[in-house]
């Protein structure tokens, strides 16, 4: 049996819009609704495998005109969608046209009516229909030949309705659905039904009397309030039924030839998806789209390179692409042009040949991974110059999610064998070189920071950090005992045992058993929230709150670190984390498997966990940490000459800020005043509000607001700088670091307040954090060479670098680290300060 799929266009688009808030192209064009629609539609088309596809659309302004003649209050009170909702509709329509999915809209009829008309037309032809919608009105269209796929919430929760499933769920037949709606009404459409009658009562009435007419024919059998409601609501019930009924006789005909699923223009679809930066969706397109007849004839032929065995004495070019296929980890491919490539077993290539190859530029998708792959085969080589394709892609567009070779090259064929990947690498490299030649600042960041630091990152990953798992186990036993004590104390307070890790059970204990106040506490489907923000509001109300917070702190540390870290130990007894350059859009390094950067440093327990990380036998740790790094860089970027002078004169910046803000001398500054100044000095860089300052210092909101106002009077260049950054973000669509690393800022124009506010904070933060990241990478590059043979860098966390060395070399290593890190960038007008410490474990440093 052939199958027709009809999509309720605006309904599905609406769900996509709110499921993907803030999604946009690099130039700021919003695309969340389009992405959500296409993503869902693709998956459903793959699942349902239709022969025909059509889209029903609500014509703006005129689609409900006829129903409003019947009931002027129909759909009254609905808020208009944001501007960027309508801004995306032409984009979606263009894409639907490329898909070959005809769009139908008509005056005076809604999308439901169009769907109903098409379903009946299909039924008369013996064609099955699947209706895709989030509007449950469509359930009245269910028949042996028509199914409804209803989106419940988001994009993934879809309910398939057949006649059998409908009856099982509602307890009535599909032909009774319209009468159900007539009785209970529909608040979303502003249809009253019978006021006071809900779904349960309506279902019960229909189970007994079959129809709305049957209910009123037996009205004398009802008593009391129910009878009164039915009597008073008779007119509104029948009006609701009339308005809610889907008009399947809508004057519109489906063109079956146009709706044929094989009418897709795949080349145009690919072009549009690439323009929208939806590269990941291209590979997900159904085969029926990719192999449409008009595309089979024009399928492009790739110029696949000729693969030859690597000769004994190869003449390498100045630029060579190296590729290792994960399915053949012991085989390497080397290509200097797109026409040919050499291949060989890694173990068969001599060290002298590697050294010869290393003299030129080595291009790879992931250079760090290439180093690891070669190291696994005992190859010790450092390339003179590298080009990391994925890192270059990140520099060019840090918001781009898909940086696979398929996405970067625009080639989404299924063949990912080595020859095809080499073709893609050549194409991407050529395009990236052109981009870099036209964007000197981005090129500088690549050549001076991101590419050279890859060697240092590889070395740190290879070295790893030694873990004292015995100490960790001992700590785990102690914490487990404390957790048990906390549980017993909480059980005693509650009067019974419960699962303290269950939000639902905890909510029951706090708000039902202990009767804690619920004013201002968020409430969800499972009860009142027990999140940290809500617990903060309850602090002091009952001693169990402090126990819960301690319990959560301990159980998180146990599961995240104490139990997890030993499982991640390699056979050498060390933890080998992975350092990523292309995760945070500021350019900061991140750490995964495990994330060593997130181990708490300011808590006693966090420091204890750090004590389990120890140096290699016979060595000690030396750590160097930039002091007030971000604030110094803020002074530079803002051009705050006064603040720069204070830093260069080693003035206590926080005390000076407090003195100037409060209008007193430095000698008169109290500890609390200095603390407030310290909080705002750093917090202002992240857009701290009066509420945030009040929460961090204990000030009242009024005091905090006054303090911030005075602060910006003293630090006018900082205020002007932050304002300038936001203006640049809005007008130019990006912000950048001191050295030219860029971050696109499309969301600063979002109509969603939360999305826009978050984007503004990120925009203010990025130039400072990004400059910090650039300088840290430069310091790592310098130290990797300066400390060679003397100390090994093993970890980088935000503003600090950790190395291990012999005890007798500590002083020399410390001096080198301090000198190199403080002098990392002589062009800066400010003096950088580095504190150096040493210890027998990470916690001591």
What annotation goes with each model-predicted range?
Residues 51-54, 72, 99-102, 124, ...:
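Non-catalytic nucleic-acid-binding/docking modules located in mid-to-C-terminal regions
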Residues 335-338, 393-415, 419, 581-665:
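Function-dense linear segments that define catalytic or interfacial modules
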